[in-house]
């Protein structure tokens, strides 16, 4: 008895009007993740994954390219409005927000969610070059 041919199911993308862009800007890299309101990741990109290596990875331009790639990855969800959460002191903070705005998203809110210790762990010792 022959089996019926297995048809590939077409993956249906849910339509999301509002999203949240989480930007993690460290001194070494920038990670951009776009989620829905519940926090389910829809797409992400990093400066390192965008082809930048070494010291070029920690530049504002690398963060801008990562934001553009992340925006391209979530276009099919139909996101129009973005709330932006920025975390970290890195050089890609501002350029990432500008790139998301230029990609066609309407930015409704920008929030700084950088964790600040209430005198927690001892910081690493200063560099001596």
UniProtKB/Swiss-Prot annotation:
The lineage of its organism: Bacteria, Pseudomonadati, Pseudomonadota, Gammaproteobacteria, Enterobacterales. GO terms for cellular component: ribonucleoprotein complex; ribosome. One of its GO terms (biological process) is translation. InterPro entries: Ribosomal_uS11 (IPR001971), Ribosomal_uS11_bac-type (IPR019981), Ribosomal_uS11_CS (IPR018102), Ribosomal_uS11_sf (IPR036967). PROSITE patterns: RIBOSOMAL_S11 (PS00054). One of its GO terms (molecular function) is structural constituent of ribosome. The keyword Ribosomal protein applies. This is Small ribosomal subunit protein uS11. Belongs to the universal ribosomal protein uS11 family. Keywords: Ribonucleoprotein, Ribosomal protein, RNA-binding, rRNA-binding. NCBIfam families: PRK05309.1 (NF003698), uS11_bact (TIGR03632). Located on the platform of the 30S subunit, it bridges several disparate RNA helices of the 16S rRNA. Forms part of the Shine-Dalgarno cleft in the 70S ribosome. It comes from Enterobacter sp. (strain 638). Part of the 30S ribosomal subunit. Interacts with proteins S7 and S18. Binds to IF-3. Pfam families: Ribosomal_S11.
């Amino acid at each position: 008895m022959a089996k019926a041919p297995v048809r590939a199911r077409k993956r249906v993308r849910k339509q999301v009007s509002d999203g949240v862009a989480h930007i993690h800007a460290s001194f070494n890299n920038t990670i951009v993740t776009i989620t829905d309101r519940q926090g389910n990741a829809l797409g992400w990109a990093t400066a390192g994954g965008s082809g930048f290596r070494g010291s070029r990875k920690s530049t504002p331009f690398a963060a801008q390219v990562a934001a553009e790639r992340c925006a391209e990855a979530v276009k099919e969800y139909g996101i129009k409005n973005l709330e932006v959460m920025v975390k970290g002191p890195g050089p890609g903070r501002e350029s990432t927000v500008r790139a998301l705005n230029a990609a066609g998203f309407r930015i409704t809110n920008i929030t700084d969610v950088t964790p600040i210790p209430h005198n927690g762990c001892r910081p690493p010792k200063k560099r001596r070059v």
